[in-house]
Amino acid sequence: MCTAITYQSYNNYFGRNFDYEISYNEMVTITPRKYPLVFRKVENLDHHYAIIGITADVESYPLYYDAMNEKGLCIAGLNFAGYADYKKYDADKVNITPFELIPWLLGQFSSVREVKKNIQKLNLVNINFSEQLPLSPLHWLVADKQESIVIESVKEGLKIYDNPVGVLTNNPNFDYQLFNLNNYRALSNSTPQNSFSEKVDLDSYSRGMGGLGLPGDLSSMSRFVRAAFTKLNSLSMQTESGSVSQFFHILGSVEQQKGLCEVTDGKYEYTIYSSCCDMDKGVYYYRTYDNSQINSVSLNHEHLDTTELISYPLRSEAQYYAVN
């Protein structure tokens, strides 16, 4: 389970909550322009856009969960169990394995428009990363400074949806999630008028009553509605620090605390990390479950014309500022 959003404020932002019950020693990884991106069924990319994002610590390969390239194009993969359907190899199509999709797109495209133009023949082929790491059932939110789309590979084939709300969670299909927002059109960020009946004098006894009916549970459909409502009504200071802070507050409205979502006996899903990409400045911000301090890694502070991956383990231990 996860939630990803876009946000326009002082700059343009993209990020996600990564919710799971197991950590794979996540780290911020920069893939420089000359690091060879090797693919199973298509030509390798020996020179490409630089990429920054969160990866799993496996076999010195940039196995990205979410990432941004130097042009500001961003992608996040989110769980889509029971719906994702990967295909057999098709010689007439562009065969990319799901774990290759993020580096393949970010390595060569600079905008959502370019992505849409070049994935019409995309075939997400069913090839595992390794015997120990089978494919995860995913769908993807892709965004730039102007627009966002959702990519889903389902039984009926490849689906590409324009995403007018800039939000993605998990099941069911994105088009159904978007339609479901119609059920919440009466929600408001202001105090509602009494439309129950003119014959009954009803009191607005509390602030926030315009949000009555806003889902508060952790299911994917509820998180989609809550994240969309929070994001689309959110205000932030027109500064970098104010915008980034507000971005994490938006994600905080749908974060998961340990103990609330039992997956198996004694194992609970929780928000392992939250991220925020500044598309304009190339900065990757994050915080973790135990460390609420916002940390940052800048793509442009590194030498990007090299051939080796650059990695920074997540700062997961709590950080405190002693006032006295």
Swiss-Prot record:
The keyword Signal does not apply. Optimum temperature is 30-45 degrees Celsius for the hydrolase activity. Deoxycholate binds at residues 2, 16. It comes from the Bacteria. Taurine binds at residue 79. PANTHER family: CHOLOYLGLYCINE HYDROLASE (PTHR35527), HYDROLASE (PTHR35527:SF2). NCBIfam families: bile_salt_hydro. Homotetramer. The tetramer consists of a dimer of dimers. This is Bile salt hydrolase/transferase. It comes from Lactiplantibacillus plantarum (strain ATCC BAA-793 / NCIMB 8826 / WCFS1) (Lactobacillus plantarum).
